[in-house]
Design a protein with these regions (language model features):
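Beta-strand secondary-structure signal
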Residues: 9-11, 59, 81, 95-97, ...
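Hydrophobic ligand-binding cavity/cleft-lining segments
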Residues: 1-61, 169-207
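Secondary-structure transition/turn motif
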Residues: 62-64, 85-87, 110-115, 173-175
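Short, intrinsically disordered, mixed-charge
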Residues: 26-34, 77, 87, 103, ...
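A conserved amphipathic terminal alpha-helix motif
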Residues: 114-166, 170-174
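Hydrophobic-ligand binding "helix-grip"
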Residues: 61-102, 202, 206
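Short secondary-structure transition/capping segments
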Residues: 82-94, 152-164, 197
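Beta-strand/loop substructures that line and gate deep hydrophobic ligand-binding cavities in soluble
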Residues: 87-131
């Protein structure tokens, strides 16, 4: 890739939700193809999955970048991690998380993204990032509507370039998720313990 690995986070706090964080996430998982905005068309290739299921490969038509394939490498009652399939231009991962924070349900999207080449970097700098941000905000707005509650404040967004050490931690985390999924198919007696479930860069700062 070209340039630093970037971490972007979008989140919304929901008050008065009809559903628990896990129930809301279950609805999001099943209705993923319906809740994503048109700018993130997950029906770009007919016949491909539109529901988040572990191991599923989903095709998303992302703004500016075109069709990108991502695989669901981790799926729990309140979290999903999608990792770019090798060979596609979006070199990174997407994490969705629904959790209880005090009296509100926080739903967040975390992106780990590195442009694949110079042309990709220039395009993202020119128009792609603002369109991408609006798309993730549109998804969170749809989730608020799905929850039956109301956002307590505008959708929040922050981003930062990760240094080399942080980038290595994230890349290791992604690789371990892939190994963990492969191990899950093995007998329990053969599975290693201790895989991290949270990106190391987020453990102290955001989760």
């Amino acid at each position: 890739g070209v340039g630093a690995l970037k971490r972007k986070r979008f989140w919304v706090d929901i008050a008065g939700a009809t559903f628990s964080p896990e129930e809301l996430f279950a609805r999001f998982r099943v209705r993923f193809g319906e809740l994503t905005p048109l700018t993130m068309n997950v029906r770009a290739e007919p016949g491909t999955p539109t529901m988040l299921e572990r191991g599923a490969t989903i095709t998303m038509a992302l703004p500016v970048r075109g069709n990108v394939q991502v695989r669901v490498e981790r799926l729990t009652a309140n979290e999903a991690v999608l990792v770019t399939v090798a060979g596609h231009p979006l070199a990174g991962a997407i994490r969705f998380l629904s959790e209880q924070i005090g009296d509100v349900v926080r739903f967040q999207v975390q992106l780990y993204d590195r442009p694949a080449n110079l042309a990709d970097w220039v395009m993202m700098r020119a128009v792609g990032e603002s369109v991408q941000a609006r798309s993730w905000e549109g998804l969170l707005e749809a989730i608020v509507a799905e929850s039956g509650g109301a956002a307590v404040s505008p959708i929040q967004h922050d981003e930062e370039n990760l240094d080399e050490r942080q980038a290595e931690l994230v890349e290791t985390w992604v690789k371990e998720l892939i190994v963990e999924k492969a191990r899950a198919a093995e007998p329990a007696s053969r599975r290693p313990e201790g895989f991290p479930v949270t990106p190391p860069t987020d453990q102290a700062s955001f989760s």
